[in-house]
Amino acid sequence: MGVERIKAAFENGKKAFIPYVMGGDGGLEILKERIRFLDEAGASIVEIGIPFSDPVADGPTIQRAGKRALDSGVTVKGIFQALIEVRKEVQIPFVLMTYLNPVLAFGKERFIENCMEAGVDGIIVPDLPYEEQDIIAPLLREANIALIPLVTVTSPIERIKKIMSESEGFVYAVTVAGVTGVRQNFKDEIHSYLEKVKSHTHLPVVAGFGISTKEHVEEMVTICDGVVVGSKVIELLENEKREEICEFIQATKQKEEA
């Protein structure tokens, strides 16, 4: 399915709610159970983090989740195995968020073969510069797996246009300068930045980093095609406050009808 399964999540003006879960935080059975829950709750796409010892783009909540996963002995192979098993039960698109090092350490061809086997539809590599994406981009294209770009508020628009011109799936627009994590509010220039990004691509644009309240979700999906919520989802899953995740999903869907 790959790129097509991601496209379907945005069809007919649908707004996408994309929760992030750390692969192996709490164990692999927990990972499968959380994916099943998020699918049943109506999430559009699930983003699955591959834990890494030097996660430069992650805020403290995601770093802690990654450390818990690594400390428990979870492996990349184990995460793929869990995804292969849960893919038989769910149709929700899977997008992996991984640093480049785990891909290269695993072997990039082998990593992408495992992605295909596990029904992974897209991959985000936050520390892979646009200039070096040929390290994995041709292999991903061949496998029909979207390499999803990150664009940032500090990037010049010409660079953003170049990055987006060769992208697939959706564009991940980073809404803060810095790492992931919970924020109180967003500055006005974020709105004009998101509108600018949207005006230069035919792909859906999804806002992420720092989105932690229903108000943030409502604000962002008014401008964008969806949101990624990471740190807050990890926090809510950890504290068994799943009904609040359902409220986030509801807030996203309501904007489709607005």
UniProtKB/Swiss-Prot annotation:
- Which CDD domains does this entry report, sorted A to Z? Tryptophan_synthase_alpha (cd04724)
Q: Name one GO molecular function term.
A: tryptophan synthase activity
User: Is the keyword Ubl conjugation in the record?
Assistant: no
* Reaction catalysis annotation: (1S,2R)-1-C-(indol-3-yl)glycerol 3-phosphate + L-serine = D-glyceraldehyde 3-phosphate + L-tryptophan + H2O
Q: Which InterPro entries match?
A: Aldolase_TIM, RibuloseP-bd_barrel, Trp_synthase_alpha_AS, Trp_synthase_suA
Its annotated pathway? Amino-acid biosynthesis; L-tryptophan biosynthesis; L-tryptophan from chorismate: step 5/5
Active-site residues, Swiss-Prot/TrEMBL:
E47 (proton acceptor), D58 (proton acceptor)
**EC number(s) in its UniProt entry?**
4.2.1.20
Please provide, in alphabetical order, the Gene Ontology terms of the cellular component aspect for this entry: cytosol
Subunit structure and binding partners: Tetramer of two alpha and two beta chains.
Instruction: Please give the name of this protein.
Output: Tryptophan synthase alpha chain
Q: Give the organism, scientific name.
A: Bacillus thuringiensis (strain Al Hakam)
